[in-house]
Amino acid sequence: MQEITTNDIKELLARIVRWTNAMEAHKQDGHAFNVFHLCSVDHYENAHSRIIAEFLNPRASHGMGSVFLRDFLMRPNVLEHIKRKGFQIEDGLGSLDSAIVETEEPFHEGRCDITIHWRGWCIVIENKIYAADQPEQLMRYNQAVEKTGERPILFYLTLDGHSASTESSGDVDYCRISYREDIAEWIAECANAVQELPHIRETLNQYHNLIEELSNNQKVLKMNSEIVKEMTSSHYHPIGA
């Protein structure tokens, strides 16, 4: 059994100090202010689904047509998955203008968080921030879409991009995407595309900051867990014990 040394304690404390300093700097430079946070949408999956769907929707109030939708579909792992399914994006933005984006769309086997209908395809985005998987959830969505005559393409969205439970997915082919990388980077790309439209740009930037905050909160929880695990590990015991 290995003893906890003074250096181990110093390293642990240094990690905590670095994180605390980073959080204080975040507050002081104004990034802690977030209208989405003030509206208490942080942890509500339905609210995030509506926000994401609004940006994806070619007919939404942002007035950008299918620009944001195309940018999302062109994300590397998203594009790889839809191409593998046979989904082809035609040249030019206009080809996606007819896409229909919905939230909480009712199917016989439940409600899908986000759906994108386009030319016989139905892209389903199952949004999981904190809620647990339901039994056979992805399998049921896949079957429900097939029953409509459309071809399903499934995405499983979480903060960190982890896999769905086997009880939910079974052998259904789906693609993992994350808020931390896929959504955050996509939102940043959308903000860059509307530099001349400050009201839309700042809304996107605010949402991007919220995603970073949620991702950082998850990192804090993971770090706390690692610290507790490290301090209670059987590999260490207090000096002199």
Roles of regions detected by a PLM:
Residues 1-241:
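Charged, terminal alpha-helix-loop-beta segments
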